[in-house]
Amino acid sequence: MSKSMYGYVRDAWKKPAESGVKKLLWERMQTWRRQGAVVRLERPTRIDRARELGYKAKQGIIVVRASIRRGGRRKSRYIRGRRTNRMGMRKATPGKNLQSIAEERAATRYPNMEVLNSYWVGQDGKSKYYEVILVDRNSPSVLADKNLAWVADTRGRVFRGKTSAGRRARGLHNRGTGTEKCRPSLTSHKNQGK
């Protein structure tokens, strides 16, 4: 069976050093670092991944690149004239992954749109870069699309952990033994699920 163009693009991203994607990313990231936290793009960087996640080149659908700092939460040291025992310094991590935080920032920048999904496009020593697919919930071309019309019925899905990255942060990508306390929600089991 013959392979499609998307298959070749996918293979190139799976082996970046051999395919030349690594060098291309290294060059592009020098530009990305100088740009803002959320930048609107003309077209997706990874067309194969974008199409897998529901992207279509039509009115009402845009792609933005969101950059977010790497590592744990930046928490300031407790300075109150004494040393507290724990200081609340170590292991202070947010309850969600960086990808879902990047999605939320993109959604805040474009309040008339809903986050459909997102995917990784690169990282360096300080930042991670994700491309977020946003859908205009009032666009006629979106409302006429049988695969995307459901977006018009939802509001703020990214802030409720309904995207793929959000569901992963809630522990819903796992099934079977050991995941009993992830459903119906983490708070219903006193956050013992993760």
From Swiss-Prot:
Keyword S-adenosyl-L-methionine: no
Name recorded for this polypeptide: Large ribosomal subunit protein eL15
UniProt feature, compositional bias: Basic residues: 162-173
Keyword Ribosomal protein: yes
GO molecular function: RNA binding; structural constituent of ribosome
Listed Polar residues bias regions: 185-194
Highest taxon listed in the record's lineage: Archaea
InterPro entries: Rbsml_eL15_core_dom_sf (IPR024794), Ribosomal_eL15 (IPR000439), Ribosomal_eL15_arc (IPR020926), Ribosomal_eL15_CS (IPR020925), Ribosomal_uL23/eL15/eS24_sf (IPR012678)
Alphabetical UniProt keywords: Ribonucleoprotein, Ribosomal protein
One of the record's GO cellular component terms: cytosolic large ribosomal subunit
Swiss-Prot/TrEMBL GO biological process terms: cytoplasmic translation
Region (Disordered): 162-194
Species annotation: Methanocorpusculum labreanum (strain ATCC 43576 / DSM 4855 / Z)
Similarity-based family: Belongs to the eukaryotic ribosomal protein eL15 family.
